[in-house]
Amino acid sequence: MSQTLQAAYAAKRKARRFAVQGIYEWQMSHNPVHEIEARTRAENAMHKVDLNYYHELLTQVIAQHEDLDALLIPVLDREIDALDGVELATLRLGAYELRDHLEIPYRVVLDEAIELAKHFGGADSHKYINGVLDRLSSTLRSAEKQQAK
């Protein structure tokens, strides 16, 4: 893999990390998304972050959270209100990528969400995130999953 491609992957990974933190903050505080984004950009070194992708994830996941929740609810084993805040933010981000970014292979979406859960979530959050998003990918990416088998 070229260094340019590696840098692009790393920039998207960093965008996801900042986005999940912003989504979590919004869930807890309901601060306006533009304030969350402005503060995050002001307080962090973001020169190696895909800023366009960060902006998209943060704004679109928050704007579409009800639609994303409607996708998640059928594949959850508990009420959505019972989810840990970090898990919910990560699941919403993963659901958004599965639904709206078909150019990203579903396994990459799952792997990235698992890494977010390992970094920010509880001890076994990554296992739960993997299970939920795998079930959701069976609905949203069924043809892709069949080809991968």
From Swiss-Prot:
What gene is this protein a product of? nusB
Query: Could you tell me which Gene3D superfamilies the record lists for this protein?
Result: NusB-like (1.10.940.10)
Q: Its biological function?
A: Involved in transcription antitermination. Required for transcription of ribosomal RNA (rRNA) genes. Binds specifically to the boxA antiterminator sequence of the ribosomal RNA (rrn) operons.
**Taxonomic classification:** Bacteria, Pseudomonadati, Pseudomonadota, Gammaproteobacteria, Moraxellales
For this UniProt entry, the molecular function terms from Gene Ontology, in alphabetical order, are:
RNA binding
Identify the HAMAP family for this entry: NusB
Q: Does the keyword Transcription apply?
A: yes
Q: Name one GO cellular component term.
A: cytosol
Task: Describe the family membership recorded for this protein in Swiss-Prot or TrEMBL.
Answer: Belongs to the NusB family.
What is the name of the protein in this document?
Answer: Transcription antitermination protein NusB
One matching Pfam family is NusB
**Listed GO biological process terms:** DNA-templated transcription termination; transcription antitermination
